């Protein structure tokens, strides 16, 4: 009975700890531009997206596993903080900070629960499985959808260049070519033309099809 109580207390400690994810605010605004979203909202949104959009994955995926991966992958930011997509200095120390955070936070759980969650987070980071690749697609597309809905507000505030977006999204098509192709042609193009994204690449001024250009940023050779 005592062991069962200790197990439950560890689980509840973890559950209380991850409530802090609601206090980690991202740079992306909500669709109505009223405020910035938090990590918990981001995770929930991507989980629903995966349930609805998994049919567009390049490879067959385990939807439940992918949903779980997305729900837990940003928990590390409770300790490590949110690293803005285009913060190069922050990204230099991001992995080290997040690895340490993952070990502490998932370590709050009983070992047989904490270790699988740590492994699931590491699988997402490694990007070697169909689930991890599709999860990355969701992680990159979700803020793009909100930026689109909010009139490109975050892009304008940070003077984001197209080269930065393409660099960040060079692996997005590895999870879903169809979703990336849609986003490239229907979201990025629109916001470049409206001036919300600085077109330092000249991609959309060329007569060649946009998809031909976007493929330059989605292959392993782009690393």
Where are these regions (language model features)?
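Histidine/acidic-rich helix-loop-helix segments that form or flank divalent-metal centers
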Residues: 10, 111-152, 164
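Acidic/histidine metal-binding catalytic segments
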Residues: 58-68, 109-121
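Conserved small/polar residues in nucleotide/adenosyl-binding loops
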Residues: 217-223
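Alpha-helical phosphate/pyrophosphate-handling elements in metalloenzyme active cores
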Residues: 34-64
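Active-site flanking loop/helix segments enriched in acidic
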Residues: 17-42, 85
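Short active-site segment of divalent metal-dependent hydrolases/proteases
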Residues: 76-77, 142
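Alpha-helical scaffolds flanking conserved acidic
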Residues: 8-12, 59-72, 131-135
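Divalent-cation-assisted or electrostatically stabilized phosphate/pyrophosphate-binding catalytic cores
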Residues: 90-104, 158-172
